[in-house]
Amino acid sequence: MKTAPRIVVFSTPSCGWCRKVKSYLKDRGFRYRDVDISKDDKAAQDVQRKTGQTSVPVILINNRPVVGFNRQEIDRLLKQYT
């Protein structure tokens, strides 16, 4: 049995690409933790420090960052779990 990947999505409620990323993950059966950086300044600072990004979405898959809704990179990192 494969262990599930640890997925964190840094997002904001008004971000359309964030909603698409979350829907994409959900439709494929992946669970994730959603962090609303508009309400969590520390998380916003942490993601900026780790990735250099101030925009969302940023997805961490087992601590490997994916910036934006990059399907190819998301699929590549999740391939071993499908």
Residue ranges and their predicted role:
Residues 1-31:
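Local sequence-structure signature of Cys/Sec-based thiol-disulfide redox active-site neighborhoods
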Residues 49-52:
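Major-groove DNA-recognition helix of helix-turn-helix-type DNA-binding domains
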Residues 30-44:
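Thiol-based oxidoreductase modules, predominantly thioredoxin-like and allied folds used
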Residues 57-67:
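A short, hydrophobic beta-strand/beta-hairpin element that forms part of a small beta-sheet core
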Residues 19, 23, 45, 75-76:
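Alpha-helical elements of the RecA-like P-loop NTPase motor core of helicases
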Residues 74-82:
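Thiol-/selenol-based redox modules, centered on thioredoxin-like
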Residues 16, 42, 73:
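Short alpha-helical
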